[in-house]
Curated annotation (Swiss-Prot):
Binds 1 zinc ion per subunit. GO terms for molecular function: hydrolase activity, acting on ester bonds; succinylglutamate desuccinylase activity; zinc ion binding. This is Succinylglutamate desuccinylase. Keywords: Arginine metabolism, Hydrolase, Metal-binding, Zinc. InterPro entries: AspA/AstE_fam (IPR050178), AstE_AspA_cat (IPR055438), Aste_AspA_hybrid_dom (IPR007036), SuccinylGlu_desuccinylase (IPR016681). The keyword Zinc applies. The lineage of its organism: Bacteria, Pseudomonadati, Pseudomonadota, Gammaproteobacteria, Pseudomonadales. Belongs to the AspA/AstE family. Succinylglutamate desuccinylase subfamily. The keyword Cell wall biogenesis/degradation does not apply. Zn(2+) binds at H59, E62, H151.
Length: 335
């Protein structure tokens, strides 16, 4: 196997490869772009016009998707996978990966769409570098651009695998992309309705990619992800890489769709959730329930029918989102 197939091993060791560019026996070029970054380019005659960005490890302790990307990279380096797409593999936060931590000082996935310019430190610099790598990769005109940013969650979920679809003014969410997500094993998709500062929102908003944050189960240490079922996603990614996707219609039967009702913002250190510490994502909330409280008598009361909570985290920094209230929606407004 080519040495660049060991990108994860190099990244965890903090080492650069001796050779920055290598070719497989099929003529696929693998090029080391920097720490945790590998570009894969098929021979020109096999290139099908797809640019696929696959990122994981934005949170360093979310190891199942990191291991999945490692397996795909190794398969390409061995010649088992024969790409027809250009691919950029990114391990988002190498320092946190080496520590087995979500982040070191700052959550990298709150530093995109220019937010890193308002901050400092190594993780702000890393977010800037990830934006640069993505922008360079997606700079070729007239190509199909797709980005999957792969995560696992810090808590359990009543819907284990789901996606978040970013928003941009004047741009419709795609039924065909949602159908692909369903085939990849996603049971639900949250359709966002405002700008965001996560990685997939940057590539969607600024670079014109179809982009998604995929939540794939519970976060566990390296080597302990046997319970995370990534089989359907892996098949989907292999098909995208090799250009062998079957034709599929835009039938969304069985895919649950949600929209954002409100974001819960933590204003002060007095903020508290009236939820159990182990509450799961997508837990239902009764209308009239006092969800959260903050200083000055501020209260978050559930007003929506069918509301659920995702990503509740009272320990975020003041001014950041501490949770999202979501409600069921349908596919009537999709493109």
């Amino acid at each position: 196997m080519l040495a660049l197939g060991k990108l994860l091993e190099l990244t965890l060791a903090g080492r650069e490869p001796a050779e920055k560019t290598q070719l497989t026996v099929e003529g696929v070029r693998m090029r080391w772009m920097g720490e945790g970054a590998l570009e894969v380019r098929p021979p020109e005659a096999r290139d099908n016009g797809t640019d696929l960005l696959l990122s994981a490890g934005i949170h360093g302790n979310e190891t199942a998707p990191i291991e999945l990307l490692d397996e795909l990279i190794r398969s390409i380096a061995r010649g088992d996978l024969k790409p027809r797409a250009r691919i950029l593999f990114l391990f988002g936060n190498p320092d946190a990966m080496r520590r087995g931590a979500r982040f070191v000082e700052q959550d990298v996935n709150r530093l995109f769409n220019g937010r890193h310019l308002q901050s400092g430190g190594a993780e702000a610099l890393r977010a800037c570098e990830l934006e640069r790598l993505a922008a360079s990769f997606f700079s070729l005109p007239e190509r199909y651009r797709l980005h999957y940013d792969l995560h696992t969650a810090i808590r359990g979920s009543t819907i284990e695998q789901f996606a978040l679809y970013p928003w941009k003014e004047g741009r419709q969410h795609s039924r065909l992309e949602l159908a692909r997500l369903r085939a990849a094993g996603m049971s639900a998709v949250l359709l966002q309705n405002k700008p965001s500062i996560v990685f997939s929102a940057y590539t969607y908003d600024q670079l014109g990619a179809e982009a998604f944050t995929l939540e794939l189960g519970k976060a566990r240490p390296f080597g302990q992800n046997q319970q995370v079922n990534l089989g359907p996603l892996r098949v989907c990614l292999e098909q995208l890489i090799e250009g062998t996707e079957p034709e599929r219609d835009d039938d969304l039967e069985g895919l649950q769709l949600f929209s954002v009702a409100r974001e819960v913002i933590k204003r002060t250190d007095a903020f508290t959730f009236n939820l159990a510490d182990d509450v799961e994502n997508f837990s239902p909330l009764e209308k009239g329930y006092v969800l959260a409280e903050d200083a000055g008598g501020s209260r978050w009361v559930v007003e929506e029918e069918g509301a659920r909570i995702i990503f509740p985290n009272p320990r975020v920094k003041n001014g950041l989102r501490a949770g999202i209230l979501i409600v069921p929606t349908d596919a009537d407004s999709l493109g």
